[in-house]
Amino acid sequence: MYFINPFKGLRPTKENASSVAVSSTDHLSKDSVLDHKNNNSWSYLNVFGEKDNSKSKEQFELMKKKSILKKDKKNSFYIYKISTGNHSQVGIVGTAKLSAYDNLHIRGHEEIFFERSQKRMKQMDNLNAQIGPIYAVYPDNKQLNDLSLIHI
């Protein structure tokens, strides 16, 4: 796994996870998004979905200050599984070196959505954090496959 590394994640505490977590906005109606934001002040949508970056930053900092989000003490990989209908996909979250991207060891999914990638870059710059995944594809890797199978 030469191109990804573990890191100390900043994530919701177990007590707050259900308040913070939200389905992909790609699968939510505008009304559902607004309802979720208005009825749950700790919803991730209040950080991720804001058009005004100053409001996003303010909410993000408040969530850290109130310990809604806490930084893990040790470096880790994070494994997730997304299921929609009859399809499931497993992912591994880690940090990647830009050189791996530059050398085409990984390829970003967001590249195909120029406007979305520009929005994400502004968001990362504003928050000094990457708060959503950047999907990347990589060559088949037995270590990653085994790791995900063990923990899912």
Regions found by a protein language model. Name each.
Residues 1-149:
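A cross-family signal for N-terminal binding/gating loops and helix N-caps
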